[in-house]
Regions:
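ACP-dependent fatty acid/polyketide chain-elongation machinery
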Residues: 7, 11-110, 118, 127-130, ...
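Hydrophobic (often cysteine-bearing) scaffold residues that line and stabilize catalytic clefts
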Residues: 114-121, 196
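Active-site-proximal gating segment of KS-fold condensing enzymes and close homologs
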Residues: 81-84, 108-116, 139-141, 146-189, ...
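4′-phosphopantetheine-dependent carrier domains
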Residues: 1-30, 34-40, 44-48, 97, ...
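Short, glycine/acidic-rich hinge or "gate" loops at secondary-structure transitions
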Residues: 67-71, 120, 137-144
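Structural beta-strand/beta-sheet cores of well-ordered domains, especially the beta-sheet scaffolds
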Residues: 29-32, 49, 56-59, 89, ...
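Glycine-/small-residue-rich "gating" segment that lines the acyl/pantetheine channel
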Residues: 62-68, 170-177, 181, 201-205, ...
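Short secondary-structure boundary/hinge segments and terminal tails
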Residues: 71, 147, 194-195, 224-225, ...
Length: 260
């Protein structure tokens, strides 16, 4: 989920009982989330995601054919061989190949080489901007920082011999900064499952220490290559039945899920 974060000074709006010589603890300054956007499996936006949560909808399914044919490398955990996986489930977003490059001043040729994670985070970043009530022009006087948690950049494996195919984690954040003409920090972080939370933490710190006056923080994770499942099966991280049972006695692994 992408969120715009803005520091709000409240000292002039409320009375605080303290001694005259008491120092002001800037770490207690309030930071507000003023815009939000998100895409997930079976949810094109935050509203649909909330609806699914309220209704207990299970959005995990077998790997769709549009990604790859899981049956070509599927086995059981007991009989697993190199190049095989015992997991065939995940939470998958639809239409990850749909992208309007000209809106972002990107040529069609360049867009083909962009990792879907980069494309979709760019789209959700702009949606967050709209939700917050800002326009790119209104950010000119702000020090906008962009912080994104991202991992599993495997799109380039489909064109490893093509120099025009591929992406770096940094470009996921940098492209947003470039499009919005942002002048604050622009960085990508990979701390595995905590990547998005880490980016939010860094965004808050950047605001509090004055590096940014406003920040966009979030994460993106989209599974596009079977190599991820091969690794998760080899290391035993993947669930054997497509169910996550966090801290449960029957839990035996996790299920990958798309999101931005």
């Amino acid at each position: 989920i992408d969120g715009f974060i803005k520091q709000i000074s409240t000292h002039s709006k409320m009375h605080i009982d303290r001694k005259e010589d008491s120092p002001v603890d800037s770490s207690k300054d309030y930071i507000a989330i003023i815009g939000m956007s998100g895409r997930f499996a079976d949810a094109r936006n935050i509203e649909e995601f909330y609806y699914n949560l309220r209704n207990g909808k299970d959005s995990v399914r077998e790997i769709p054919k549009e990604r790859w044919d899981w049956s070509e490398c599927f086995s059981t955990k007991e009989n697993l061989k190199p190049g095989e996986t015992y997991s065939r489930w995940g939470g998958y977003m639809d239409d990850i190949d749909k992208f309007d490059p000209l809106f972002f001043n990107i040529s069609n040729q360049e867009a083909k080489g962009l990792d879907p994670q980069e494309r979709i985070f760019l789209e959700t970043a702009v949606e967050t901007l709209e939700d917050s009530g800002y326009t790119p022009k209104s950010l000119d006087k702000e020090k906008l920082g962009v912080f994104v948690g991202v991992m599993w950049g495997q799109y380039q494996l489909y064109g490893a011999d093509d120099a025009e195919t591929g992406s770096s984690y940094a470009s996921v954040a940098n492209r947003v900064s470039y499009f919005l003409n942002a002048h604050g920090p622009s960085l990508a972080v990979d701390t595995m499952c905590s990547s998005s939370l880490t980016s939010l933490h860094l965004a808050c710190k950047s605001i509090l220490n004055g590096e940014s006056s406003i920040a966009l923080a979030g994460g993106v994770n989209i599974t596009v290559h079977p190599n991820k499942y091969l690794y998760l099966s080899k290391t035993g991280f993947a669930s054997t039945d497509g169910k996550c049972r966090s801290f449960g006695i029957d839990g035996d692994g996790y299920v990958p899920g798309d999101g931005s």
